Amino acid sequence: MKEGIHPKNHKVIFQDVNSGYRFLSTSTKTSNETAEWEDGNTYPVIKVEVSSDTHPFYTGRQKFNEKGGRVEQFKKRYNMGK
């Protein structure tokens, strides 16, 4: 690999703006806003709109499409289904 062309990877705090949930991870993204983590160190804070704390797939509050597929909709529309 070439030297000096790869972005630096460092620890950052991701914060969900909807719930306030925070988690520590690594990223190439950085921020001017910083916060202290549970380990006593200060890390940049990246604000996200959706995280595993608020995403419907992870919370179990997802909606399923109850309309059926295209064939079922066609049959229903033209009274072809029995």
Swiss-Prot record:
In terms of InterPro entries, this protein maps to:
Ribosomal_bL28/bL31-like_sf (IPR034704), Ribosomal_bL31 (IPR002150), Ribosomal_bL31_B (IPR027493), Ribosomal_bL31_sf (IPR042105)
Q: Which domain of life is it from?
A: Bacteria
Q: Mind naming one GO cellular-component term on file for this protein?
A: ribosome
Q: Name one GO biological process term.
A: translation
Family per record? Belongs to the bacterial ribosomal protein bL31 family. Type B subfamily.
Q: What does this protein do?
A: While neither of the L31 paralogs is essential, this protein does not seem to function as the main L31 protein. Has a higher affinity for 70S ribosomes than the zinc-containing L31 paralog; is able to displace it to varying extents, even under zinc-replete conditions.
What is the protein's given name? Large ribosomal subunit protein bL31B
